[in-house]
A protein has these predicted regions:
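Conserved NTP-binding catalytic cores of kinases and kinase-like/nucleotidyltransferase enzymes
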Residues: 1-85, 183, 197-200, 319-334
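An alpha-helical support segment within catalytic cores of ATP-dependent transferases
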Residues: 4, 8, 13, 124-132, ...
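Active-site acidic catalytic loop and adjacent metal/ATP-binding pocket
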Residues: 31-38, 46, 119, 171-219, ...
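ATP-binding pocket architecture of kinase catalytic cores
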Residues: 32-144, 149, 154-155, 178-179
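Hydrophobic packing residues in well-ordered alpha-helices of helical domains and bundles
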Residues: 59, 105-112, 138, 163-166, ...
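Secondary-structure capping and boundary motifs in well-ordered enzyme cores
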Residues: 137, 186, 211-215, 261-269
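Active-site activation/catalytic loop segments of kinase-like enzymes and analogous catalytic loops
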Residues: 146-153, 215-252, 266-286, 298-305
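ATP/Mg2+ or Mg2+-diphosphate-binding catalytic cores
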Residues: 277-334
Length: 334
């Protein structure tokens, strides 16, 4: 047993939890780890967030507020921010990703979009509770695609013209995000962070990076998921249905279907540039190769927009010139 695990065991004893078994529950794209602790009184989750690398404060604060507005997120039962340990209620082991198929998707996504509406309408009670998703952050995120995926991982020597195209497109996508109405944004609202629960489905995880930002961001995270994809026609129907629900719920969104879909699609391009860059960074910086296989799907969402948005053509030409089968060759430059 390593020192950190021993510290966790000692802390559990300190808070009066006597475990029958402890096993890894999951790890995410950060330095956090999660363990499932089984006791005579039930099952719990321990978040291990090393304090020199992770701050548990945002998780605690956001969890409390999200529970107050009616979302099914873990309850923080015990906390020690100094040591970096939280004891959480257990939302189970059934991720959306493991359950989604053609038969289940309408029901599961229906519940997820209902919860998303609770999140977005809840933001009107206190919009300043979360930090702004501003232009510098949007641009920094997209730069990960250039720096970590194209240059670091694929080893591309980008021309001045290609660099200009990338920067111009980054600015365009940031402007699209900022012209949208704002609501609370989970920021990773996808199938690996949604749990199927018997009551109050879905359970929602990994919300500590939430911000106040573009109203289509979480919707595109859900419907253009980096880990599972659906036919374009089906996605458009979901988007139109959610736009209608948004208007009925009083969200300040456009009534124009074409404009809303453009917001959604270009927001997706921003998110997918960021995500593809993060997947490459996770390999080179953190030694996590498992996300590399998701990069072709992620950038593929952008390529699918070729005939819909001429303003994205220069970016898509760069993307389509790359052999994406090479992305999983982890012997690349490190």
């Amino acid at each position: 047993m390593n020192i950190r695990n021993q510290q966790m065991m000692d802390w559990l004893q300190d808070v009066g939890l006597h475990s029958r078994s402890i096993a890894p529950a999951s790890a995410d794209a950060s330095f956090r780890q999660y363990f499932r602790v089984r006791t005579d009184s039930g099952s719990f989750i321990v978040m291990d967030a090393p304090p020199d690398k992770e701050d548990t404060g945002p998780f605690i604060r956001v969890a409390q507020r999200f529970r107050e507005i009616g979302l099914n997120v873990p309850e923080v039962l015990e906390q020690d921010p100094v040591k970096g340990f939280l004891l959480l209620s257990d939302l189970g082991q059934q991720t959306y990703l493991g359950l989604l198929n053609a038969s289940s998707v309408e029901r599961l996504y229906g519940d997820a979009m209902g919860a998303l509406m609770v999140l977005q309408t809840g933001s009107y009670s206190d919009p300043d509770f979360l930090p702004q998703y501003d232009r510098p952050l949007l641009l920094t995120e997209m730069s990960l695609f250039r720096d970590w995926l194209l240059q670091k991982h694929l080893g591309l020597d980008l021309t001045d013209e290609q660099l200009r195209v990338l920067q111009d497109t980054f600015e365009l996508l940031a402007s699209n995000a900022l012209e949208q109405p704002s609501a609370w944004v989970h920021r990773d609202y996808h199938s690996r962070n949604l749990m199927r629960t018997d009551e109050h489905n879905p359970g929602i995880l990994d919300f500590q990076d939430a911000v106040l930002g573009p109203v289509t961001y979480d919707l595109v995270s859900l419907l253009k998921d980096c880990y599972i994809n659906w036919p374009r026609e089906q996605v458009e129907n979901w988007v139109k249905g959610y736009q209608k629900l948004s208007l009925e719920s009083g969200l300040q969104v456009t009534k124009d279907e074409k404009e809303y879909l453009r917001w959604f699609d270009l927001m997706g391009a921003q998110r997918h540039l960021k995500a593809a860059g993060i997947f490459a960074r996770l390999y080179h910086r953190d030694g996590k190769a498992g996300y590399l296989a998701d990069i072709p799907r992620t950038v593929g969402y952008i390529s699918q927009l070729r005939d819909l948005y001429p303003e994205l053509t220069p970016l898509i030409e760069i993307i389509d010139s790359i052999d994406w089968t090479a992305v999983t060759r982890v012997s690349r430059a490190s």
